[in-house]
């Protein structure tokens, strides 16, 4: 019939696992770098752009389509955080334009402090989701941002913030794996 629209079933899996894998890999390697396990930041920046940034933003966009405002917002803004953080670290090298001055420690302290506040507000919302591991991931993410702020304020050693970031990454990887396992009927506590 003319003017008739057919809607196909768009049921799909949750993109949240991809977002948590993105956070997990990027945070794990950033944590290891900050703990002094290696000194080459190239791989960490690549992880931050591709997995931390793009994977989380794409997961967020897909969650917007599913009507999941919390998941969409969290993955999208934190994905853009990884992209912004990468730009801040690459801009002084002149990769995108003429070399720029490196961000000052105080500016980075306030940058990470603001993200810690936003993460904490989102953590409150996780209490209503009903998945305890999501709350755990957000709590350690809060601690990651606040510990990085303290590093940039000059009151906390970078290695401690690195350890907290590593824990964030590992918790996020566990959650991502649990979501995937659960989707195929394997029970994993989360």
Task: Describe the predicted segments one by one.
Residues 187-190:
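Short, highly charged, low-complexity non-transmembrane loops/tails of multi-pass membrane proteins
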Residues 58-65, 84-98, 121-125:
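Membrane-helix exit/interface motif
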Residues 34-41, 91-106, 152-159:
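Helix-coil boundary and interhelical linker segments in multi-pass alpha-helical membrane proteins
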Residues 110-121, 132-152, 157-178:
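Alpha-helical membrane segments in multi-pass integral membrane proteins
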Residues 40-53, 100-115, 136-138, 163-166:
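Structural signature of hydrophobic alpha-helical transmembrane segments
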